């Protein structure tokens, strides 16, 4: 949410560490309920399509976890999703806020109402079709520059004009 942007500018380590910790703990708690040890690869992104500050993670999670016998166990909630997305969103927000409050109590109190005003959305995608798809996805987020050449429409002495997707519309 936008409420963490000013904190991300002034206390970036706090925000970024909290994103990773809350994500991992959320995933682990859902896995534990199904008696699975989960895994995750997470990549931090600090900007959005419009190049505005938008700290968020892109996480790749296997379609299951390791059970108490050391065996991989596939798991699905409904359709192709591992866990219920609305529940993930609620638990993630609670864990993020709890950790932020512990690390930066004064700032947390300043933005607390904004953090709880709207629901948070954990975006989930259907599973990748192949290992190649996983590598391509990771490549887009680990080797990406802010404005790739295909988005640039014009450049002059003072301006760069580029295309972007407005995800809020």
Predicted regions and their residues:
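Beta->alpha loop/short-helix hinge microenvironment recognizer with preference
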Residues: 1-169
């Amino acid at each position: 949410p936008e409420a963490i942007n000013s904190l991300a500018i002034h206390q970036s380590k706090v925000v970024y560490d909290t994103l990773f910790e809350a994500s991992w703990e959320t995933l682990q708690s859902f896995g534990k309920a199904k008696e699975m040890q989960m895994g995750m690869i997470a990549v931090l992104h600090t900007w959005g399509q419009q190049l505005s500050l938008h700290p968020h993670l892109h996480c790749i999670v296997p379609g299951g976890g390791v059970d108490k016998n050391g065996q991989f166990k596939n798991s699905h909630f409904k359709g192709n999703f591992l866990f219920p997305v609305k529940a993930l969103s609620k638990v993630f927000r609670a864990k993020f806020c709890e950790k932020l409050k512990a690390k930066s109590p004064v700032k947390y109190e300043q933005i607390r109402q904004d953090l709880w005003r709207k629901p948070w959305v954990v975006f989930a995608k259907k599973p990748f079709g192949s290992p190649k798809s996983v590598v391509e996805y990771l490549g887009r987020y680990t080797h990406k520059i802010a404005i790739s050449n295909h988005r640039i429409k014009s450049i002059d002495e003072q301006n760069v004009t580029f295309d972007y997707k407005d995800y809020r519309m």
